[in-house]
From Swiss-Prot:
One GO MF term attached to the UniProt entry: glutaminyl-tRNA synthase (glutamine-hydrolyzing) activity
Organism listed in the record: Trichodesmium erythraeum (strain IMS101)
Entries under Gene3D superfamilies matching the protein: Amidase signature (AS) domain
SUPFAM superfamilies in alphabetical order: Amidase signature (AS) enzymes (SSF75304)
Identification of the protein by name: Glutamyl-tRNA(Gln) amidotransferase subunit A
EC id: 6.3.5.7
Self-association state and partner proteins as the record states: Heterotrimer of A, B and C subunits.
Active-site residues per Swiss-Prot or TrEMBL entry: 75, 150, 174
Protein family according to the UniProt entry: Belongs to the amidase family. GatA subfamily.
Keyword Membrane: no
GO biological process: translation
A GO term from the CC aspect: glutamyl-tRNA(Gln) amidotransferase complex
EC class name: ligase
Amino acid sequence: MASISDIHQQLISKQRSAVEITQEALENINQLEPKLKSFICVTAEKAIAQARQVDAKIAAGEKIGLLTGIPIAVKDNICTRGIPTTCGSKILQNFIPPYESTVTQKLVDAGAIILGKTNLDEFGMGSSTENSAYQVTTNPWDNTRVPGGSSGGSAAAVASAESVVALGSDTGGSIRQPASFCGVVGIKPTYGLVSRYGLVAYASSMDQIGPLSRTVKDSAILLQAIAGYDPKDSTSLNVPVPDYTKNLTPNLRPKGQIRIGLIQETFGDGLDSSVLQAFTKAVELMQELGAEIQVISCPRFSYGLPTYYVIAPSEASANLARYDGVKYGFRASESENLLNMYAKTRSEGFGSEVKRRIMIGTYALSAGYYDAYYLKAQKVRTLIKEDFDKAFAKVDILACPTSPTTAFKLGEKSDNPLSMYLSDLMTIPVNLAGLPALSLPCGFDQQGLPIGMQLISNVLKEDLLFEAAYVYEQANNWYKFQPQL
């Protein structure tokens, strides 16, 4: 499937209609879903109706924006009015939001065509999209492997051309890690840049919505559309949104003007040799293109994982307390009384990983352990942010592999939660610090599985990430490779 800019040109030149483009996406979905299972819900009739409206505008001579008529997939933890939003959980089965999230409202206003809702690990808790109550999504490059998580459905949909672009959410790597595993581009924006109104909360101090796409430019265009201040979100940043496509040129700034720091702590045990090799070649190419490369130490980087697994479950245990079967979603039957109904509903409605994190969070927040765990984790979080601040005094961008490995086999880590958690080792510290980070393809391993490189910048420097990522992308052909489906 073509890029946003290519489809836009096809529409305004009347080479193709919005209905034809939407039908092509829906045909891809019908053909591939039995294998991939990227979508929980496909809104075919609604999508065709939206496409007809776009064609009517074009026929009437109205000027259309870049996203008008572009098929897009939305992760199923982002509320969509009139369309089920399950969060991949039994406890929200058949829940249809009565309101629209800010990001999807912006997309609808821009004329984008929503194809449906994509699969995810339940409430965003997972790194493989195996924790969904409804189905297991597979990797388009190898159907015996995971697509990553928790935005695995969105990443798989984009990689397989079921959708042009997609929205995901990222709490500890849930956009970037699946982007790496599926060979696409994914960006987690600065915390507060994109409104969280209508995003079902997991860990509110880290959750952030962002784009997934096949090219850097498409991610820049999509972020441009969804970013900006929203009074409905108390953590929304009231800052101007720059033109993210303005500096997208194939040439890097004059030699030495962009300084890239390689995070020393990311090259230890557990890093696959194929991932290290691909990343090293990518860094060498960036140096040839004019970047100044140096090694940077972030001493507390490795503390990110244990810190996250105290703070995120603590916030989740509070956020998920609202699901009790009273007003919406699943309700257990044959309860003896109200308290029994609460307990049965939550016991039957939540999956094992969600229960595990609720229990960890409740324990960390309990009276006897609050200071020892939660408060201490918040202090370490501050130290991690300080390490990043010191690093950005020396460099403009930090770089490391997105994940220590390529996509692992389905079921390989299901019985080993700690091994699963380690796949987000490189991405989690970024969320703790509220920084923006982008993953883009930088090669393949010996089995033909994609490898991702992560670029991290200081707050609100997404334009710099896009600029550097675009230069690298255009200097090679990784983004042109497609899975053979």
